[in-house]
Amino acid sequence: MIKRLNNFFEKINIKPQTKNLINYTTYKIGNISKLFLIPKNIQEAENIFKAAIEEKITLFILGGGSNILVNDKEELDFPIIYTGHLNKIEVHDNKIVAECGANFENLCKIALNSSLSGLEFIYGLPGTLGGAVWMNARCFGNEISEILKKITFINDKGKTICKEFKKEDFKYKVSPFQNKNFFILKTELNLKKENKKIIEEKMNKNKQARINKGHYLFPSSGSTFKNNKSFLRPSGQIIEECKLKGLSVGGAEVSKYHGNFIININNATSNDIKSLIEKVKTEVYSKTGLLLEEEVLYIGFKNQKS
């Protein structure tokens, strides 16, 4: 492993940095990474991804830092690629072409200034476009797959591909990029011309809904559990019906505002969050027979699906 890592770093010619992931995750929980890479542009990112494939190195791609829980007990021993500088956004008629690290706020504001509608549902979320595509981000009855046109990515053979996708290629919180060694570079979005005032009203309405649900009061990863249509109601409602709002473990708590938010209310550890997630799952299953599935990804935990 050490030899492959040395070969990898020799090929990419980028010096790894030491960073604390507390500063890069929305949970404000994490640990030290001494293998933190910050590509300055798409070309550097391509070199990193292709070298990783050649050397069989597992990477973690870090965007906005939402929807993840990082182990704060162990040093992270795998390269982490931060996409924060891969944020170029271009407008072409009714299309936006954006790199994987473009954040939602900038995307939405550029779309608004260009009188383009279709991104209002993600306004107020902390993520990036690459992560949104990877997980088929969804909110307020809309999902990112509805506005996708083309995606440029590197496949598991190290080849850069630009491919058109349809909504049918995606499912609820599932994309063709999950469970594959593919790396999303940039995405073309197909939007619609609309009056700026109408777009802005939708954006503000969605942001206010998030404020009303307490999204910004405490650090969180966003929704903790996926919704399951067969349960006939959202996971947050099920958790509320089980009277689990306010349940806590250490510094972690089930939000009193939204049952599907587990928040870092008082210097929670990753174990606090993880233990509370398991406690909620156990209580819900005991009371309803329904097994909730996590939406949050576990990073740096041994023998843990991530």
From Swiss-Prot:
Residues 28-194 form the FAD-binding PCMH-type domain. One of its GO terms (biological process) is peptidoglycan biosynthetic process. The keyword Cell wall biogenesis/degradation applies. GO terms for cellular component: cytosol. Its cofactor is FAD. Pfam families: FAD_binding_4 (PF01565), MurB_C (PF02873). Keywords: Cell cycle, Cell division, Cell shape, Cell wall biogenesis/degradation, Cytoplasm, FAD, Flavoprotein, NADP, Oxidoreductase, Peptidoglycan synthesis. InterPro entries: FAD-bd_PCMH (IPR016166), FAD-bd_PCMH-like_sf (IPR036318), FAD-bd_PCMH_sub1 (IPR016167), FAD-bd_PCMH_sub2 (IPR016169), MurB (IPR003170), MurB_C (IPR011601), MurB_C_sf (IPR036635), Oxid_FAD_bind_N (IPR006094). Pathway: Cell wall biogenesis; peptidoglycan biosynthesis. It catalyses: UDP-N-acetyl-alpha-D-muramate + NADP(+) = UDP-N-acetyl-3-O-(1-carboxyvinyl)-alpha-D-glucosamine + NADPH + H(+). Its EC number is 1.3.1.98. Transmembrane segments: none annotated. GO terms for molecular function: FAD binding; UDP-N-acetylmuramate dehydrogenase activity. It is an enzyme of class 1 (oxidoreductase). The active site is at S223, E295. It is found in: Cytoplasm. It comes from the Bacteria. NCBIfam families: murB (TIGR00179), PRK13905.1 (NF010480). PANTHER family: UDP-N-ACETYLENOLPYRUVOYLGLUCOSAMINE REDUCTASE. Belongs to the MurB family. Cell wall formation. This is UDP-N-acetylenolpyruvoylglucosamine reductase. It comes from Borrelia garinii subsp. bavariensis (strain ATCC BAA-2496 / DSM 23469 / PBi) (Borreliella bavariensis).
